[in-house]
């Protein structure tokens, strides 16, 4: 039987500003990537999001990003490897305080936005992130773009690595994500998104924006919680995966 994890970036509200449909999306996923206060989120949001994940029996992961609230962590920054490593440790530590108090563990770490996309190509940045995770707890799973520098470096270091694919994003022919500034970067057609997901899991292929087929490994599917179609996507994905006899389980269970 095919197996896959379903994750979403949640806990990205901030103060009086609400973002996403976390309360609904969390009912359908198996792993939650919780913002740690730098690109989004705040202490109260983190506390509430951890509790929501626990109530819904969803595995918890840290979602560290660049210190860029105004840009939602989607703007590239020039940082040293030492800085990047410290940034990631700091944010994992923030989430750890809430999970420790709640008596649960951090299952995984998935970088956010520009940090994620840059680390997919930049070996030095990927190494800094992977080392931060390893030094905190080598049992934590590192999540990265499938077949990227991030996953390659994590595996070399000895971490358990989850290769991630995206239901609602278009791909370039080199396996990277199409920039959000490019037309067609975000897929709004739920039927198309679901069909692509099933093909990625069963065939290990995804059609790039130029029509080429790209080989891809799919341990975990991401549905963005801030996408206006997130709830429709995740609902339809869960329904279709069941029909296709694809079991949805957490990363930890999948990678054992």
Swiss-Prot record:
It catalyses: 5-oxo-L-proline + ATP + 2 H2O = L-glutamate + ADP + phosphate + H(+). Disulfide bonds: none annotated. The keyword Manganese does not apply. It comes from Alkaliphilus metalliredigens (strain QYMF). This is 5-oxoprolinase subunit A. One of its GO terms (biological process) is carbohydrate metabolic process. NCBIfam families: PRK05406.1-3, PRK05406.1-5. Gene3D superfamilies: Glycoside hydrolase/deacetylase (3.20.20.370). SUPFAM superfamilies: Glycoside hydrolase/deacetylase. Forms a complex composed of PxpA, PxpB and PxpC. Catalyzes the cleavage of 5-oxoproline to form L-glutamate coupled to the hydrolysis of ATP to ADP and inorganic phosphate. Belongs to the LamB/PxpA family. One of its GO terms (molecular function) is 5-oxoprolinase (ATP-hydrolyzing) activity. The gene is pxpA. Its EC number is 3.5.2.9. InterPro entries: Glyco_hydro/deAcase_b/a-brl, LamB/YcsF/PxpA-like. The keyword Nucleotide-binding applies. Keywords: ATP-binding, Hydrolase, Nucleotide-binding.
């Amino acid at each position: 039987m095919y197996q896959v994890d379903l994750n979403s970036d949640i806990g990205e509200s901030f103060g009086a500003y609400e973002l996403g449909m976390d309360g609904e999306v969390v009912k359908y996923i198996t792993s939650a990537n919780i913002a740690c206060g730098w690109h989004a989120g705040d202490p109260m949001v983190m506390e509430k999001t951890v509790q929501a994940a626990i109530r819904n029996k969803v595995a918890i992961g840290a979602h560290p990003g660049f210190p860029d609230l105004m840009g939602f962590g989607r703007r590239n920054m020039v940082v040293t490897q030492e800085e990047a490593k410290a940034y990631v440790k700091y944010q994992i530590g923030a989430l750890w305080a809430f999970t420790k108090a709640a008596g649960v563990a951090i299952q995984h770490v998935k970088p956010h936005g520009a940090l994620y996309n840059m680390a997919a190509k930049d070996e030095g940045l990927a190494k800094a992130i992977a080392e931060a995770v390893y030094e905190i707890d080598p049992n934590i799973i590192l999540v990265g773009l499938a077949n990227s520098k991030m996953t390659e470096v994590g595996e070399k270091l000895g971490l358990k690595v989850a290769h991630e694919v995206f239901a609602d994003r278009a791909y370039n022919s080199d396996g990277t994500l199409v920039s959000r500034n490019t037309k067609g970067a975000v897929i709004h057609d739920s039927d198309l998104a679901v069909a692509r997901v099933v093909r990625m899991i069963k065939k290990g292929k995804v059609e790039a924006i130029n029509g080429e087929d790209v080989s891809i490994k799919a341990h975990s599917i991401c549905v963005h919680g801030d996408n206006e179609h997130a709830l429709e996507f995740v609902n339809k994905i869960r329904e279709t995966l069941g029909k296709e006899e694809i079991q949805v389980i957490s990363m930890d269970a999948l990678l054992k």
